[in-house]
Amino acid sequence: MYNPPPPSGSQGNNNYYRQPSSTPGVSNPNPQANQFLPPPPSNTQAPRPGFPPSAPPPSAPAGQYSMPPPPQQQQQAGQYGMPPPPSGSGIGTGVSLVKDQQISLSKEDPYLRKLTVGLGWDVNTTPSAPFDLDAVVFMLGANGMVRQPADFIFYNNKQSRDGSIFHHGDNLTGAGDGDDEVVSVNLQAVSPDVTRLVFAVTIHQPELRRQNFGMVPRAFIRIANQETTRNICRYDLTNEGGTNTAMIVGEVYRDPQNPQNWSFIAVGKSFPGGLQFLCQIFGVNAS
């Protein structure tokens, strides 16, 4: 089962993300399944997947929000078309979070309207198999699932239909300091029936390249006010991934008591199965 975060301000919940027992190999993953093997030849490549088909798969496990329905009026969509903010930009360091810790973004910054979400990582390099990590976003409704395939924001679908989210592109190498990939979010333009924005990082072609998050010793997510560039919070992950190939880093979600306010929870939960597994549990057909 996948449950939404508890109300902002509560203590950490280590069972926030739990692997569904009905998914083979998830509740009791084989510890040998993702062990590192020698890297494949450098000329072994496979095409990147395109945008998933329009028909979502059958219902997958999802959490429920016990909250009043959000306002029904549609916000006017925001527009993005600017280049990403400078790598590592932002004023101050913000609040340093630990796993499962939550923070009310609206209380920390009452005038907050637009977010810069920066994600970064360092990797253990292997000469013949360079890493390619991808940041993705799932826009979830109250049932814990995407409403439509277009609610899956990634390198081949960079902007949400309501214009509220813009992915600034795929960094194929992860080289350099600061943010490796950046996502812009206009909170005022997020559709009223979207309650959660899940930010995750996955490894591209993990089986082919014999790679996993145990080879990514440092990763982070930071949340900043895009208009003032002030950093609100940051979560640094330390050896959270093990032999897994997908990681939910954090989540921005509406306050159950006041849907106009937003909070953030540092999740830091990794899974086997890569991007396809995340798509399965959030209702995106990525086959």
From Swiss-Prot:
Where does the protein principally reside? nucleus
Among CDD domains, the record links this protein to:
TerD_like
Q: Which GO terms describe its molecular function?
A: cAMP binding; pre-mRNA binding
Q: Where is the composition biased (Pro residues)?
A: 49-60
**Which parts of the chain are C- repeats?**
60-68, 75-83
Region: 2 X 9 AA approximate repeats of CABP1 motif C; residue ranges are 60-83
Point out the coiled-coil segments of this chain.
none
Is Nucleotide-binding tagged as a keyword? yes
Q: What is this protein called?
A: cAMP-binding protein 2
* Native source organism of the sequence: Dictyostelium discoideum
